[in-house]
A protein has these predicted regions:
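Short, hinge-like loop/turn segments at secondary-structure boundaries
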Residues: 28-32, 112-114
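Conserved donor NDP-sugar-binding/catalytic core segment of glycosyltransferases
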Residues: 1-26, 30, 92, 98-104
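A cross-family signal for key residues in well-ordered alpha-helices
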Residues: 66, 84, 146
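Anionic, Ser/Thr-rich low-complexity intrinsically disordered regions
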Residues: 122, 132-138, 144, 148
Length: 192
């Protein structure tokens, strides 16, 4: 029904954190959905990349299923692979902001870091399957880590002024998370 109403063949919606989620889950949700941390690629109205529905909240027509053969056997990144194949087959996708789901996140930072690692491996596999799918936005996490390391090294070996960009980012993440989650504790956890 959503496909017919929106005039598209596949759709997806954003994910949200339910009030009952733990503070760590809310902080992880912030890191996975904030425009500042993901470029808006995970279900935001403003995005640096064309919207790709994710399997946690994806719907598609029977024609899409027949044309694509459904999900591939990938262990990680199978949802992005499906979205790429949907678009490559000429079908249209859209974000339905009102079709949100409460996406329960990992319960510890250790489990979250493992998930992020697996997502990075999935991006490599997706590039091998679909070389055209690699976009500038996918390099931002690596650039962020390198930038943080350079700021820290500059602060240690040159001047504390080198830490200012890092401190500014921490401040922006903290304020944005506090604004969205209305919790100082979640805001502190969001900068971990």
């Amino acid at each position: 029904q959503a496909c017919q109403e929106a005039g598209v063949d596949a759709f997806g919606g954003p994910d949200r954190a339910h009030d009952s989620f733990t503070n760590i889950q809310k902080a992880i949700n912030y890191s996975m959905t904030s425009f500042f941390t993901t470029g808006g690629i995970r279900g935001q109205k403003q995005s640096m990349e064309k919207f790709h529905p994710r399997s946690f909240n994806m719907g598609f027509s029977q024609e899409v299923l027949k044309a694509t053969g459904g999900f591939s056997g990938l262990r990680f990144g199978e949802d992005i692979d499906m979205s790429i194949r949907i678009m490559a087959a000429g079908f249209k996708t859209c974000l339905l902001p009102e079709a949100y789901v409460f996406h329960k996140r990992r319960t510890s930072f250790r489990k979250f870091f493992k998930q992020v690692y697996n997502s990075g491996m999935a991006r490599i596999n997706l590039y091998l399957l679909h070389p055209h799918s690699l976009k500038l936005v996918h390099f931002l996490p690596a650039c962020f880590v390198i930038g943080c390391l350079l700021c820290l090294l500059g602060g240690i070996f040159f001047s504390w002024y080198c830490l200012l960009p890092l401190l500014l980012l921490i401040f922006v993440f903290f304020i944005d998370s506090w604004r969205l989650n209305k919790s100082i504790k979640v805001a502190f956890l969001s900068i971990v």
